[in-house]
Amino acid sequence: MFGLDPTLLFLLFFCLFAACAFEFVNGFHDTANAVATVIYTHSLKPTQAVVWSGFMNFLGLLTGGVGVTMSIIGLLPTELLIDSNVYHSMAMALSLLISAILWNLGTWYLGIPASSSHTLIGSIIGIGVGHALLPENSNKGISAINWDKAIEIGQALLLSPLFGFALAIILMYILKKTVQNKAIFKEPKKNTPPPLWIRAILVTTCTLVSFFHGRNDGQKGIGLVMVILIAFLPGYFAVNTNLDLVEVKTSLIQVRQIVAKIDTVPLSEKEVESYHKVLKAGDELDTILVDGLTTAKLSVDQKFQIRKAALTINKNAKKLIESESVALSATDLNALKRATAGKKAPFFSFGASSSSGIAGITDFAPAWVMWLVALSLGLGTMV
């Protein structure tokens, strides 16, 4: 099956099972965050709260697109995602899964409120550091890790609790000053639900926390599964085989035309390097696509070349877009963003999801992957 020998096929299914187990553990590990208040205040019965939370996690993941998914995959060094040696990729996938699952299970068993997101991101960065320290990668070292993306995600993880803490204090202060009925600030009586309006607020917040947990944390599971599929079956999942290559070529032409307008004189050394990388990768991608080949006819090596070129273009084009030294009109900057990162995804994108522009080559997830992870997360939440 899939051209894999029995051992690799077994390991593929084992890794997929482990990824589902991670999402399952993620579900029952994080359920308390959403349902604690509605159960404690008797707004909902425990079974009602847990089932409702599970359903909203499931729905949130299915409608969330792949934005967070690609941020997770983007943490890995590009070389790891285009390694044609399946055993290297297998070691990466197993290391990631085993470390994340063991920590999640351990913290759940000991009752430690640890974050699944921190666990997964830490595992991915650990893999990147381990890969960078291998003798054959000594020339690049830890610079091969996507530190820009790691810092971006790290800032979000650090700011999230601070934002929640500050906003909770402000809202509590406003309620204390404006609500006349002080009974709502006292400990709830046994088996007595709160006033209807308080109950409605608590159920609404439980619903929204569960829904957005699925949209955010659930997508990390999709990223995990996609890393496994790219590692074991690059011929099927290294690039999006359903993408319209005419659209890709149109986006590529736009990128090359706009980047060619940039005056390199005021740019720093690193920005000039990014400039040349975009143009070189654009030439490589155009060479592969010039004959109008469909991805179904391309070899695995060619798909890896397409993936590498697309990742290189997007990564370095983003640096140029964000640079203050790049003198481009607002129209050109917006066109470059659309041609590389694609249009902003709709809030609801049910089922299979992918980006547009050149990002659409690598930023995608099949419908069955989203359903698999959504079911794992939803069922785990109900445990």
Q: Which stretches of residues belong to each language-model region?
A:
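Interfacial segments of multi-pass membrane proteins
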Residues: 37-45, 121-134, 225-233
